[in-house]
């Protein structure tokens, strides 16, 4: 019934509207104590805890940035058994993003194409939401960015401020490689390093799925030079050749945007495998992108995530 009736009906509704409705339901669920207790008991994974530096993960399965952009429901999401959750991407000032519709399903490929444009409510709203965090229950990351990626001074000031502002609640931070030019990002990370000495929260670089393998040595060297603690591999891809089941007309109709979901799994695994073999062993490597089932998760672990 789900595949033949329910799913086709749901897929007629705009993907972002479905996402927003799920967020609303999670906000309602927040106040349903007995149901939350039951949910936690049902989704309590029988997994071996994992420790890295001073972070204690209840398990190795997390939720990437992009779902909880406003950091408004990470506590409720943790009831589903995630060992860590990443909120964001967050910028100092509100970003409306690109016009809707901006998230599209390609069900034949088990993929989404998104061109949201880093929409988020800004620092103050996210900070208010972060105050609901329950320490020790899960690891919480925050993906941060600047409103002015082309302005070195503003980018440095904004990202350093976000790192400091969220430090009471964030267990780690992520910055997207490619969202800021390397020469500006270098200046940003030099400034953040001074704050990091005081605050001590780790910083990861999230790499895009299309990063050339031959560029990874340079990125690893950059990361070591700037005291980066690890990598998340990978984010979306622009490579339309990955969409082997959708028609050209369907892909053209959707238009621009990054591909996420199953089609990017092999690119993600390739990057994870290279990082695992060549990055310093003390760096944490988190596999992301294309993980849809336990089979993909196992492949990520085998690759070194």
Listing of model-derived features with the role each one plays in the protein:
Residues 14, 63, 85, 126, ...:
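Conserved, mostly hydrophobic/aromatic
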Residues 27-29, 34-43, 177-187, 222-278:
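Glycine/Thr-rich beta-alpha phosphate-binding loop at enzyme active sites
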Residues 147-159, 181-184, 204-224:
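Active-site glycine- and acidic-residue-rich loops that bind
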Residues 72-79, 211-225, 276-277, 281, ...:
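Catalytic cores of alpha/beta
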Residues 60-62, 84, 137-145, 172-174, ...:
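Structural preference for beta-strand elements that scaffold enzyme active sites
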Residues 88-137:
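A gly/proline- and charged-residue-enriched helix-loop-helix capping module
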Residues 93-102, 123-124, 179-201, 210-217, ...:
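Active-site-adjacent beta->alpha loops and helix N-cap segments on the catalytic face
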Residues 65-68, 143-145, 207-213, 284-295:
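Glycine-rich beta-to-alpha transition loops that act as phosphate-gripper elements at the mouths
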């Amino acid at each position: 019934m789900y595949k033949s009736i329910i799913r086709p009906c749901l897929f007629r509704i705009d993907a972002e509207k479905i996402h927003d409705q799920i967020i609303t339901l999670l906000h309602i669920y927040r106040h349903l104590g007995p149901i939350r207790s039951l949910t936690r008991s049902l989704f309590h994974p029988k997994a071996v805890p994992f420790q890295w530096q001073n972070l204690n993960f209840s398990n190795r399965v997390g939720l990437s940035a992009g779902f909880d952009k406003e950091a408004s429901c990470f506590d409720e999401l943790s009831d589903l058994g995630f060992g860590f959750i990443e909120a964001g991407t967050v910028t100092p000032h509100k970003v409306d993003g690109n016009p809707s519709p901006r998230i599209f399903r390609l069900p034949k490929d088990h993929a989404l194409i998104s061109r949201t444009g880093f929409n988020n409510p800004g620092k103050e709203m996210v900070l208010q939401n972060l105050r609901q965090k329950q320490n020790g229950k899960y690891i919480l990351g925050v993906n941060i960015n600047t409103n002015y990626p082309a302005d070195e001074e503003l980018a440095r000031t904004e990202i350093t401020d976000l790192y400091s502002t969220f430090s009471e609640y964030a267990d780690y931070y992520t910055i997207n490689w490619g969202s800021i030019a390397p020469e500006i990002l270098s200046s940003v990370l030099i400034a953040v390093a001074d704050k990091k000495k005081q605050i001590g929260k780790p910083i990861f670089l999230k790499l895009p799925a299309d990063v050339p393998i031959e560029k990874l040595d340079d990125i690893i060297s950059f990361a070591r030079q700037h005291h980066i603690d690890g990598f998340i591999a990978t984010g979306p891809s622009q490579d339309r050749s990955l969409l082997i089941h959708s028609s050209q007309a369907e892909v053209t109709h959707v238009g621009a945007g990054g591909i996420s979901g199953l089609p990017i799994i092999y690119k993600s695994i390739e990057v994870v495998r290279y990082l695992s073999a060549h990055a310093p062993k003390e760096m944490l490597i988190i596999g992301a992108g294309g993980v849809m089932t336990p089979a993909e998760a196992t492949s990520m672990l085998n690759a070194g995530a």
